[in-house]
């Protein structure tokens, strides 16, 4: 029976620290929530080696033309969407490189779609509809580790030959067993029993942040700690781009503006042009040979 399964889930347990939360004043409630949230980063730290291995898998697949797909239901699906949608503007990657699939489709972003998470075949079909191939990475996300929709997607992804990851919050879950590499973050019982949008959701977001950020660093999208492939898609990002160039090269605003324009709004190219003293075409050629890594491109011209 499902009730027996739920009773055995850590995330469905009662938190002894918050049994009196309904009797607290407003500040007391906030303190209880904050105290529980403080434990999440330490729980994530316990899985840092698994997260690092996952990043290496993602980068390897991306360099072979693969993509990363998050798949989840409810809060877990929305966490994947949050992470995936921020990659293109932050790192200048194609919208297809990191994608998110949520049970029930886009309407489920704003409104719960009853029964969608219980349908294994729907998970499989959504993978098919996205055109997932053996080059891709599928990362199933679910606090419980037992969501049928996600399991259906993971099982089919394994049949295709995808690398399959999981992010869960309960030990020895079915999803962990299905994954090539499970990431199991034990955050414990929630502040409000079963409300996995809280500590579980926070942990999921932290892990997703790490997966994509570390992957983008290793893909040459970052120079020092600067987002050098940022897309200049609005006024704020144009000004950020100029500021990044100024910080990376110690030039004045007008110089940064000039080189950004010359580099066709490529922050990375503008920085390398300034640092190398090369014209646009020569700088671009060297950057391309070094797969977009500014540091490696600079090393290569030092050897000339």
From Swiss-Prot:
Q: Which domain of life does this protein belong to?
A: Bacteria
Q: Which residues form the active site?
A: 86 (proton donor), 117
Reaction(s) catalysed by this chain's protein: N-acetyl-D-muramate 6-phosphate + H2O = N-acetyl-D-glucosamine 6-phosphate + (R)-lactate
Q: Which Gene3D superfamilies match?
A: 1.10.8.1080, Glucose-6-phosphate isomerase like protein, domain 1
Reported EC number(s) for this entry are 4.2.1.126
User: What does the subunit section of this Swiss-Prot or TrEMBL entry state?
Assistant: Homodimer.
Q: What is this protein called?
A: N-acetylmuramic acid 6-phosphate etherase
Organism whose genome encodes this protein: Clostridioides difficile (strain 630)
